Design a protein with these regions (language model features):
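Flavin (FAD/FMN)-binding glycine-rich loop and adjacent Rossmann-like elements that form
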Residues: 1-209
Length: 211
């Protein structure tokens, strides 16, 4: 609504992670109280690490994928995208160096295997449809006569000043109406995916993709 969008992320992979040592810690996710990201963030050696966002997934033996770090980017601006891609690669290297420093048993012999070909964009243009799903709808667990799906994902907004809302309890969900996929004033047209008609906070939930 204001033109301010969520942060982007350039995903990356590490290879030659020690399988045994990594099995002892399980992951380096932000939620782990002794995750190395808590030492990396704020360390002057890693100035591009501006928050503690870190998700990791074991892809294969010694091969780890990361959705980690944030880069400010406007995906409608080619220059901004280019700058974000360059900064994202530098950020991936800094995160790897931090993992080597603070979790050397697992990452000491690892190397940066790849960075994504495209910037991960969480929020960009959305299409104005016959109905706009809002934060209030999410909070109310609203049902719709034209519901075509259900969602229970939390409000996951990647902004440092974002308001945090309580997650749904087990078994709770809301409906997703067909009318937030049909562009206003058009016929025989349907939109789906990130451009779904929502407000910014509701988008933080509906944008989510299962792993």
């Amino acid at each position: 609504e204001s033109g301010s969008v969520q942060e982007g992320t350039l995903c990356f992979t590490l290879s030659n992670v020690d399988p045994y040592e990594f099995s002892l810690i399980g992951n380096v996710h932000t939620n782990r109280t002794n995750s190395p990201i808590h030492s990396i963030y704020g360390n002057p050696k890693y100035p591009l690490v501006k928050d503690k966002h870190m998700n990791d997934k074991l892809i294969g033996p010694g091969f780890l994928g990361f959705n980690a770090g944030h880069v400010t980017v406007d995906s409608t601006d080619p220059a901004s995208l280019t700058e974000a891609m360059m900064k994202g690669r530098k950020l991936a290297r800094q995160l790897h160096e931090g993992l080597v420093e603070f979790e050397p048993k697992s990452f000491g012999a690892s190397f940066l295997a790849s960075t994504a070909n495209l910037m991960g964009i969480r929020e960009s243009r959305r299409i104005k449809c016959d109905y706009t799903f809002t934060l209030e709808d999410w909070l109310a667990r609203k049902e719709f006569e034209d519901g075509i799906g259900r969602n229970c994902y939390y409000i996951d907004v990647h902004k440092q000043d974002a308001t945090v809302y309580p997650r749904y309890k087990k078994g709770e969900s809301h409906g997703i109406p067909f009318s937030c996929l049909t562009p206003a004033g058009l016929k025989n047209v349907m939109v789906a995916g990130r451009c779904i008609s929502t407000d910014s906070y509701a988008h933080g939930s509906l944008r989510g993709m299962p792993p």
